Amino acid sequence: DKENAGLLDPFVIMKNIEDGATLAKEILTFLTGISTRDGEKFPVLIRAIGKVKDSEHRGLLNVIAELRKEETVIANNIADHIESFVDYDFAQLLFSDGSVENAISLDNQLNIIQVADLVLPDKDTSFEEYTTIELLSVAMLIVISTFALDFIHSDRSIFKIVDLDEAWAFLNVAQG
């Protein structure tokens, strides 16, 4: 659904800019498989995320744009890799250019996050065996879980409930 595009972008869903950048790092390293131990790719990705964090328009699509600006083989390969996920209709929730207005907010009394068609891997499936849809589903699970924790820890003077419908699906995944 085009009207929901980018709602789960880490830069959009997190209230704190630093938290958004941290979650963006987690999501993009998860999706691309770039390890913190990769001395070539990891610094390039982190630098691009940092530039987006410091910009006016924050969104994962802008990380791709920042990588392209570097005009290096490594940066272009990382940009291509991230962009390959954007082509999935399902992934539209995760990627924005930072112009999303209908954002999910910690200040709302009620947030309903319903993601249809999540395909979560079996608990026994190794990370290397995840399909692309499973990777994207787990990435969304990570974003939703991080938002839920942020919601729980915000303004503790207000009573809150987080209801995870069909939580068994979340709990059957290693990341859940």
Which residues does each PLM region occupy?
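P-loop NTPase motor domains
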Residues: 1-176
